[in-house]
Regions:
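Flexible loop residues that form catalytic
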Residues: 43, 114, 154, 215, ...
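Active-site acidic/histidine proton-transfer and metal-coordination neighborhood
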Residues: 22, 78-181
């Protein structure tokens, strides 16, 4: 099992990121705890120097399995489903701007809250139409570079759009792109799925990336989820990618990262 953990290259408001800020120090810590990968949360690719990122990551013999994009929503409120066409266009262009960096690292680009929330006065159907249109454009732009997008089903308290694997598989069919799949997250699945294991089986080969956090969004092992069953089911689908920790820095980032990997290494 290949394990990674989320690291924001800059300060961020999003709570479920264990490491933020001092990039070089945090990469060294992550490697020291035994992780093989670091999932980079990047609000805007223009804010980072790809050569410097790669140098630090290679120095510590890590890889980058995925790029997170959620801060574009959290910090700037960019989204694919905003009623303002200028904001929708800015969101699409921002996501497309991740393609060169993703190609460089052979990383999946994650689509979380960049999908947005249906605004007042707009129907759910219109939001879905905007979402599908945006995903089709982004997927088409990424395909020539071998870059894949993974949309993350999120719980009902964060968005009204795409909560379950069933929702996600329907969206995949409507988007119609081979390089578009899903990121499954155990925290959200625990809220929305009748059975985490059955949902993983249903998603199968369209699982492009996988996040772990326990039921309380702490590190795996701090809540009540059965990770032995979950991970066994995941690998039975043929999944060979990274399992990436996206959890709150509780009781603190270092303790959570260390305890999380110690727990997951049992399986």
């Amino acid at each position: 099992m290949k394990l990674s953990i989320v690291l924001s290259t800059h300060a961020a408001q999003f709570q479920a990121v264990a490491f933020k800020g001092d990039f070089e120090t945090n990469v060294a810590k992550i490697a020291g705890y035994g992780y093989e990968g670091v999932e980079l949360a990047i609000r805007d690719p223009k804010l980072v120097n790809p050569e410097e990122l790669e140098a630090v990551i290679r120095q510590h013999r890590l890889v980058v399995p995925a790029l997170g994009t959620g801060q574009a929503w959290g910090e700037e409120r960019l989204s694919f489903t905003n009623s303002d066409p200028a904001i929708r266009r800015a969101a699409i262009e921002r996501i497309k701007s991740h393609i060169p960096l993703a190609a460089r690292f052979k990383a999946v680009v994650i689509l979380g809250l960049i999908r947005g929330i249906t605004p007042a006065g707009q129907t759910h159907e219109q939001s879905m139409a905007y979402l599908i249109e945006a995903l089709q454009e982004c997927s088409a732009a990424a395909a020539p570079y071998g870059v894949r997008y993974a949309l993350e089903p999120l719980n009902r308290y964060e968005t009204d759009l795409i909560h379950t694997v069933t929702d996600g598989l329907d969206l995949i069919e409507r988007v119609g792109a081979d390089n578009f799949g899903l990121l499954l997250d155990t925290f959200h699945m625990n809220i929305e799925e009748p059975s985490i294991e059955e949902s993983i089986r249903a998603c199968g080969s369209r699982i492009f990336h996988f996040h772990v956090a326990d039921s309380n969004r702490w590190y795996p092992g701090a809540g009540h989820l059965d990770f032995k069953r979950i991970l066994t089911t995941l690998f039975e689908t043929g999944y060979s990618g990274f399992v990436s920790g996206e959890f709150m820095p509780k009781p603190d980032a270092d303790t959570g990262a260390r305890r999380g990997i110690e727990y997951l290494r049992q399986f």
